[in-house]
């Protein structure tokens, strides 16, 4: 492309063959036209790379970057390195977007623009901000509501529009050492340097909900929780000067509570053995900061099981197993 595009759409691709064509087609049929698409083939073995190449031959807005497999965080970082647009948008390779997606993201000139998502697949549902809201860094706490089921700033790297210069000039990257929720860390790093934010009441992003595999469940561990917590703690220390201690306390507590919820939701899945479950919970209890995290759970009825799991891990595990067995028996009867 002879001139710099307004938007760079970065799509990490890894064995998404069954969904890839729908994904790319949804991007090419946008009402907003000034963009490039970077398809980052992360060592696919199912022909996804060839699908990407075939689209690039037909549309000059598409660039394909082939690389060895190193995970989605690495693929997104590779896309950032090659992005030419003034702004960056991330779209996962198995998702789809409406034809107004990019147009809506360009309604504001804020450093960060956030919209909602429409979930489909294993789970369904639509979540989006209720109305347009423009705000600065000083109002961050008001949009980081501990009692809210959805935090549009915290979750996802998709359904957002970032400013490329902020990312590149400050060396903001996806942490390639993390197994899950690397988007959380990327977003927090970005907030250290962004001044203006806009939430928009759209749900143009189609987020495909995939079932977690047995292997992924076994990879979830206390060590992963520790890595996340320690990395986020560094972000929180830097945020202190920008938003003050009161706002920081709200952001910190809410973010860590959501992280803890995710950790235990993985541990309570089918397929986790009692040995793995107890080992992870006991290791978590040994952490110097586990008391702080557990204090966040006080009074939260929906996660009472987590509190009991920390106090009585083996009993809690077998209680869960027994309850699931009863439910299965009744449903089959």
Task: Indicate where each model-derived feature is located.
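Cell-envelope/extracellular polymer assembly enzymes that use nucleotide-activated donors
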Residues: 5-8, 26, 36, 185
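Donor-binding/catalytic cores of nucleotide-activated saccharide
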Residues: 72, 93-200, 205-226, 233
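Glycine-rich, basic loop-to-helix element that forms the pyrophosphate-binding segment
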Residues: 67-83
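Short, well-formed alpha-helical segments that are part of the catalytic scaffolds
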Residues: 15-29
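Short aromatic/hydrophobic "clamp" motif used to bind/position activated sugar donors
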Residues: 88
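Short beta-strand/loop segment that forms part of the nucleotide-sugar
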Residues: 34-43, 63-68, 93
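Membrane-interface aromatic/basic loop that binds lipid-linked glycans or pyrophosphate carriers
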Residues: 269-333
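A conserved acidic beta->alpha catalytic loop
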Residues: 26, 41-50, 92
